[in-house]
Amino acid sequence: MRVDYDVAAALRHEGLKPHDYDEICRRLQRAPNRVELGMFGVMWSEHCCYRNSRPLLSSFPTSGHRILVGPGENAGVVDLGDGQSLAFKIESHNHPSALEPFQGAATGVGGILRDIFTMGARPIALLNALRFGPLEDERNVGLMEGVVEGIAHYGNCVGVPTVGGEVAFDSSYSGNPLVNAMALGLMETDEIVCSGAHGVGYPVIYVGSTTGRDGMGGASFASAELTKASLDDRPAVQVGDPFLEKGLIEACLEAFKSGDVVAAQDMGAAGLTCSCSEMAAKGGLGIELDLDRVPARELGMTPYEFLLSESQERMLFVVKPGQEQSLMERFIRWGLQAAIVGCVLEEKVVRVLQKGEVVAEVPANALADDTPIDRHELVSDPPLEIQAKWDWQENLLPVVGLKGINLNSQSHFGSNISWDEILLKLLDDPTIASKRWVYRQYDHQVQANTVSAPGVSDAAVVRLRPQQGKGSVDEVKRGVAAVVDCPNRWVFLDPERGAMAAVAEAARNLSCVGAEPLAVTDNLNFPSPETPTGYWQLALACRGLSKACKTFSTPVTGGNVSLYNETRLADGKIQPIHPTPVVGMVGLVHNLVNVCGQAWLEPGDLIWLLGVPIDTTVAVDPRVSLAGSSYLECIHGLVTGRPPEIDLKLECLVQSFLRNSITEGFVRSAHDLSDGGLAVAVAECCIAANLGAHIELPSSDARLDRLLFAEGGSRILVSVPSTQAVAWQKVLNQAKTTAPGSVFDQYLGVVTADDELLITQAGNRLVQLPLNQLRECFEQAIPRRMGLDLSSSV
């Protein structure tokens, strides 16, 4: 069959390869027309079909006693007990946010919310994981301002609280920021709305906004590297309307309660093409779509434009015959467009009509189920660059003493730097510093169910208040905790260990608020898998995620893969991001009374370290290290070394012990040791509480910078009332008896009423800093780099 288009040019435009075209022709038994080729282009993109990553994802654990819905639907669903279920998922909007940060981030929020309420759940919380280049570059400042404003605008207007997240900075993200949005939704019914069409002849209803030319080919755009020419792809960035989405949420939840909706699918990536093909393929049926009935925003739209538009706030329903009119009236009352645009077919095809003519007809499974897989060879050894970094040893660092470090003359800090100065430098690192400038723009109290606000605890906590208005706030005892985590520097240096650490830290943060970890949603942000290094990073990270999720019994319920996150520089070189597998994890809080924050509560409380103890010998415990640490990068300008070993057994022991201790009322505050190690964690607790601390390090021949700033080791800082000292020691001894050979506690010091942080060793002062200096450094790091007024940042 001859075609009326330039095949080579069309393939380039759609991001398809010649062998893809040959396969399409084989499946259709003919050459595709230009509309059909566009449909294949978006549906066979990495963004939609995971053609490079699908074999790796199959290793993830996906089942468990609480899992109601796993991968394959719009969102995962877990059983919370007491007649409540939680829908949750994370998605990326990286490439759109790089070009139009406000709309890219805003529509990312809108899209993840639709995934949640399409399942029949009411959205109750949002989180986000963001990555930017250094704020010394004005372009990165502009990107960050736009992204944060977009997230705030959409979340605040739609009435869903943004309760947590993480923000990190690295030069690898300068041309390609990451914007990952996570949402949670509460369900109180057994009726989970799925997306598979059923009922031959059942009507298909279009609901929501009109269809325009915005977002054209967004799925293909999201599956390619960014270049200067990408600026021409601004039409691929969608435009959102949070007020319309608010009406869509209410109208859809009402419609679902009626029982008249048999299947639902939001129109996200690939728009009508994706929603029709996925609903048809999952149901084992077909769908006929009449474009003349689709509410259009612009005149003269072609079939290609209708099918590939990613206009926001749109849904597709399959409904029971005879109920379509009452449902459409309901939607119209909410100010939404509603139209019958097609029907369910027995024939397993997506058939598209315009002006009575068939403009496209493709087997549904060819678009949404039986899609191609690109297989890559996994190299057996790490890349040479990484092998060289693994050879690094701590003894290569400058000599340390009680007063600090003797640096070489080429250091930008001069020849010497004290421990006080080092701690302040770390607190001034934007990745470690307070994110108050970010989260104060988010409404985290809307819906009045937020228990732990951003910056207060290691994980967000939201009250599980009944949606039907039964019971007062005070009567609600249970909550759900959520967190997003990824140590991207560790993943860059060792993808398997780094990914394991991401899961471990997410679970540890949930445990720090007293929550039982339940399940995971993941967002795999990686560069191109078509290079040996890129695929090695992706494959080993998936291996690490799988191993850790199995150990923690936290199944993966779904997520997102975002590849080709890299920038082609002016000189033609490729700048890949650090591989960033973001782990979103949810947990159940059985009693909100016991929720812990980071802040000390009372002077005199005892400070204990759980996890691998501080070294008392020169021998280096491989579970705690300066390799890959914030200290190494911030102070010495090095991103090197092999990150610490991840002791998953110890993680489980420590976290279980912590949760039990919180439940029993022993632990008053809890904060995990992460970026910056012990000294930074103690400083953060002091800043949060406005109380001081005196930490006495044990006598040791180990390097002092290792004692103060090393990372890893499943470590958590807790405070215990002094009145409970004897009982607490009994609990610790009992835990050691239960798990012989695992020493995982160490007394460090005491909370003080003094306005300073004091760290000593054998009576020698190492760190002595007033709280106001710590706080000023911590709170002003980001606003100062952005050139903002500092008077309101503390």
Swiss-Prot record:
Single GO BP term: 'de novo' IMP biosynthetic process
Reaction catalyzed: N(2)-formyl-N(1)-(5-phospho-beta-D-ribosyl)glycinamide + L-glutamine + ATP + H2O = 2-formamido-N(1)-(5-O-phospho-beta-D-ribosyl)acetamidine + L-glutamate + ADP + phosphate + H(+)
Positions with a binding annotation for ATP: 50, 89, 522, 559
Binding-site residues for Mg(2+) 1, renumbered to this chain: 91, 560
InterPro entries recorded: PRibForGlyAmidine_synth_PurL (IPR010074), PurL_linker (IPR041609), PurM-like_C_dom (IPR010918), PurM-like_C_sf (IPR036676), PurM-like_N (IPR016188), PurM-like_N_sf (IPR036921)
UniProt-annotated binding residues for Mg(2+) 2: 115, 266
Listed GO MF terms: ATP binding; magnesium ion binding; phosphoribosylformylglycinamidine synthase activity
Family: Belongs to the FGAMS family.
E.C. number(s) listed in UniProt: 6.3.5.3
Protein name: Phosphoribosylformylglycinamidine synthase subunit PurL
NCBIfam families tied to this protein: FGAM_synth_II, PRK01213.1
